[in-house]
């Protein structure tokens, strides 16, 4: 079998630029590790100690116990809600991700009761719903490790009433179960009010004796409403729901026992469907991935050849480039990552009409062949100016945006630099429903750069004031705008609000993409109607 050409690196490890890049990336990676370590502590040492004193496993220990030994866990949005709510909700108070349980990829959603009793802040809801979206798109069983006091009542107006609020969790459970996607719950602590529907709407539910409780109204509410005095265990404990109400199906003695039962349930599930594409044995890149730190500038404004990234991410550093001589500010081609076939779309400069047409053509090819797409974003936008507008750059850009929106194959996006304006759309930003989207720590995302925004707004202001506006006044006007864009475009600002699925170390890019592709392979590709096949690939 003929193999694709091997990419070589032109970057010089002895150069000053390499050394500067490497040092900057190391500093960013250290900051990322520090932030992640803080988030993983949940509610802090005192809350963790109280949790353990009750005989419970810590939330992350629960996840580790559930997973197959030694298998990886692809965590989703581990820094969600960072800096929000006065810092009261690390990781948004819930752990979510994809892991292997009894040999099967599953989505795991585990409440962290060390964070405000596992109650749901607005970002907790958003993260839980995002995990369910991942499960639905990739047809992955959902495993809920429940230990939650329900909605965070002081913010009920941002948690309860709207379409994408708390109630959507149970809607999603019903719809996924109806679609044959297993829903399994283990009640390891409180399961209160609306949250009681998590186990009640699961296909199978486990509860821990003298620890798990399920009730729509807790003892204080029952007393206030009816005058009845009852303990939590008498009202909705494991014995009640396993022997009397039938809300749960399995009674466990402790967390470890409950998690073993969940593993056994997963082991009984039917085998997943055949893989939607051929997967070959993985091959490590021939160009050392550790060189990503040195080869890639931290500042997205500094030009470099994006093939330096591709060579360090794909199997064997092999890359069959498509249309290499045309539209050269967009690199497209075929490769494999952890054995999975991928079509890569990577920015190598600003987008011109030719680049956009090339991108649209390539995306259509991948759709036709059932090949997942990987977008490597580092884009300041489309070229502007009279000649380019007259040349139809808007309609050519629209072709690529349409192709991105309409393709049937899985899309995975990594923001490795800037993500600005319409370039974000053409390169499969969040609005274009990539199966997954991650950002590097150096990444930036905004409608435009801070300097450009400040200049645009300053021009409008100057036109209003005329000669009365001095250079000092202009700078005083522009400085806070630049600062605002710098803050709001930061990767950590973005990930705290779940604009992505997490900030990742560049050196983890290959592994993260491989795990995500494995998850994507659980879902069949939508089939075209051969009786009405529609259009073939248009040569743009």
PLM-predicted stretches and their roles:
Residues 1-540:
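Ligand-binding clefts of soluble mixed alpha/beta catalytic domains
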